Amino acid sequence: IARLKRLGKIRTSETYTAALRSFSGFMNDKEVLFDQLNADLIAEYEAYLKGRGNSPNTVSFYMRILKAVYNRAVEDGLTEQRHPFKSVYTGVEKTLKRAISLNDLKHIKGLDLSLKPNLDFARDMFLFCFYTRGMSFIDMAYLRKKDLQNGILSYRRRKTGQQLFIKWERCMQEIVDKYPINETEYLLPIITKRDEDYRKQYTNELHRVNHLLKKIGKQLDLPILLTMYVGRHSWASIAKSRNVPISVISEGMGHDSENTTQIYLASLDTSVVDKANKKILDLL
């Protein structure tokens, strides 16, 4: 975990910390040697996670992290490879639908929230995510003003390290123009205070925005809970429905990992992706 932090992989270090806490809770905070990790213990841990109501993907998530730590210990010569994870599930199941329709998006965009500035802000962040090909909230939070130059928004995905380029459209500028100029180096009003921890500001805003989006979703009687992540899925789903090539969007994010779609998007000629994005934005 300390190594991940040194490498700047803060989010990954946080997920490893969460997994460590989970396994420590299972072991009642007793220390466990790598040599003690065997198939029976791992099977018991899997049953423990399921017994606490975790979904198959959450159970698999913790197992994959624990397996990665174990394999690292094997590589470093700290233990022998005994394959303790051979009998537990470490794949990813397709989750429930996380996308909304084009009509739903139009309803969100057309909602009169002029007297509800907090909901209006959450709606703007959701739309900005959609406008920018499903940009994740953490990447939105850390967009710098200097990332926007000559009509092109360029940024590096914090999760994958992929460099992405997006043609700046009028709808994006309209959202930026609604809010006072940020006193920090960042473009959007998510991280706004120089004297407060930036990471904490991001996580607080993510929770607040998702809470507000759920209210908007209930107001419109949407079929699923509205969150920032729905914006990511919806762009890909709508793109697919409008015959944008699968090579551009990689199966509407119905893949085994979130990374795949962004890798596809980043590896293509950006003009192809920009045209695809413009095609989708023109529908609204």
Feature locations, PLM:
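Active-site/catalytic core of tyrosine-dependent DNA strand-transfer enzymes
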Residues: 105, 169-223
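N-terminal core-binding DNA-recognition domain of tyrosine recombinases/integrases
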Residues: 2-11, 20-96, 111-114
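Short, polar N-cap/turn motifs at the start of nucleic acid-interacting alpha helices
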Residues: 146-154, 222-224, 244-263
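Short, basic (Lys/Arg/His-rich) helix/loop patches that form interaction surfaces
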Residues: 110, 114-117, 210-251
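Basic, Lys/Arg- and aromatic-enriched nucleic-acid-binding interface segment
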Residues: 83-137
